[in-house]
């Protein structure tokens, strides 16, 4: 029987003086492959939250009318007309995709895994990876993307993008309604278009690009299923555990060479079968990732200026 791999990162946990950033850095360095699951907690750590001033300053009229608690509740609301639906969604997409700046934790993570075998699955639908200029062949958007549109009747498997129309909707809307003629229409059946995001009842349109992303992700998992794999879960809650949390735990259990690492202030239940191969990091996600990059002795010794450029980007 093959002996399971030894992880120095697990040993570091035994030392109370060890910083969490060092544990993260060590695990990334020693992994043969890294499967990264990213949820809303990572974008929120960069300040891209769905609550507070970011919500109240951009949607005061919707809050007054519907008493919404946050943007998530507002985005799931069954609006009475397509004019109102697109009045909200056009503002939401502009804020959370078209105009959302680059996140510092995404830049730092990209540098941390540079040169490693890695693949990302994300339940986020914002622009974070595009803004940070990731190689998108390593990213799988399992929940869709805000900028994409699909037929509301799901009459065909194709998504569409029209940035200019979204911006025009924001400018033209009045009293929480866009002009009737601006409602995007399906080119096949003429039904109104909607945002390409997964719904519990009907799912979402999964086009050729979606399936290409899925195929690349599955191929990576299969290629490294027995390797020394770090299953790194960042900012994932329990809203949709079937996409990241449960598969990561299951793959860790099946591969004795793997460890499961979660970055989350909340402590969710860990199956008994993998508790001894689980690392739970509780510090602020953005701070933890950027600190791990700064503490990378190789990066600091070889190219200090490049590291500082990554962490200081604001475009």
Curated annotation (Swiss-Prot):
Transmembrane portions of the chain: none
Gene Ontology MF terms: metal ion binding; NAD+-protein mono-ADP-ribosyltransferase activity; NAD+-protein-aspartate ADP-ribosyltransferase activity; nucleotidyltransferase activity
Binding, NAD(+): 40, 123-126, 143, 238-240, 264, 268, 285
E.C. no: 2.4.2.-
Entry-linked SUPFAM superfamilies: DHS-like NAD/FAD-binding domain
Domain Deacetylase sirtuin-type: start-end pairs: 13-299
Reactions catalysed, as given in the entry: L-aspartyl-[protein] + NAD(+) = 4-O-(ADP-D-ribosyl)-L-aspartyl-[protein] + nicotinamide
PROSITE patterns referenced in this protein's UniProt entry, alphabetically: SIRTUIN (PS50305)
EC category name: transferase
Cofactor(s) recorded in Swiss-Prot or TrEMBL: Zn(2+)
Positions with a binding annotation for Zn(2+): 151, 155, 186, 189
Regulation: Is inhibited by Tenovin-6 in vitro, but not by nicotinamide.
Keywords from the named record: Glycosyltransferase, Metal-binding, NAD, Nucleotidyltransferase, Transferase, Zinc
Note on how the cofactor is bound: Binds 1 zinc ion per subunit.
Assigned protein family: Belongs to the sirtuin family. Class M subfamily.
Other notes: The SirTM-mediated ADP-ribosylation can be specifically reversed by the Macro domain-containing protein encoded by the same operon (SAV0325).
General function of this protein: Catalyzes specifically the mono-ADP-ribosylation of GcvH-L (SAV0324). This activity is dependent on prior lipoylation of the target protein. May be involved in the modulation of the response to host-derived oxidative stress. In contrast to other sirtuin classes, lacks protein deacylase activity, being unable to catalyze delipoylation, debiotinylation, deacetylation and desuccinylation of proteins.
Protein name: Protein ADP-ribosyltransferase
């Amino acid at each position: 029987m093959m002996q399971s791999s030894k992880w120095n990162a697990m040993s570091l946990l035994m030392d109370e003086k060890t910083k969490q950033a060092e544990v993260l850095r060590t695990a990334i360095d020693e992994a043969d492959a890294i499967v990264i699951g990213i949820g809303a907690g990572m974008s929120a750590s960069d300040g891209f939250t769905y609550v507070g001033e970011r919500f109240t300053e951009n949607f005061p009229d919707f809050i007054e009318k519907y008493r919404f608690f946050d943007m998530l509740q507002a985005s799931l609301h069954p609006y009475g007309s397509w004019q109102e639906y697109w009045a909200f969604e056009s503002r939401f997409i502009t804020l959370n995709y078209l105009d959302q700046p680059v996140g510092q934790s995404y830049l730092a993570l990209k540098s941390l895994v540079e040169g490693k075998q890695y693949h990302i699955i994300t339940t986020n639908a914002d622009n974070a990876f595009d803004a940070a200029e990731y190689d998108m062949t390593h990213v799988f958007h399992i929940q869709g993307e805000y900028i994409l549109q699909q037929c509301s009747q799901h009459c065909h498997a194709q998504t569409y993008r029209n940035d200019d129309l979204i911006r025009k909707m924001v400018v033209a809307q009045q009293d929480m309604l866009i002009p009737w003629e601006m409602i995007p229409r399906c080119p096949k059946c003429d039904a109104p278009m909607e945002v390409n995001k997964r719904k519990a009842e009907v799912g979402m349109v999964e086009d050729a690009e979606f399936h290409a992303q899925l195929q690349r992700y599955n191929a990576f998992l299969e290629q490294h299923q027995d390797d020394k794999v770090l299953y790194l879960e960042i900012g994932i809650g329990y809203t949709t555990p079937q996409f990241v949390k449960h598969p990561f735990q299951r793959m860790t259990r099946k591969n004795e060479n793997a460890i499961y690492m979660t970055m989350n202030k909340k402590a969710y239940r860990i199956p008994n079968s993998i508790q001894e191969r689980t690392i739970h990091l509780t510090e602020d996600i953005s701070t933890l990732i950027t600190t791990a990059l700064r503490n990378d002795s190789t990066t600091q010794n070889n190219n200090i200026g490049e590291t500082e450029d990554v962490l200081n980007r604001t475009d």
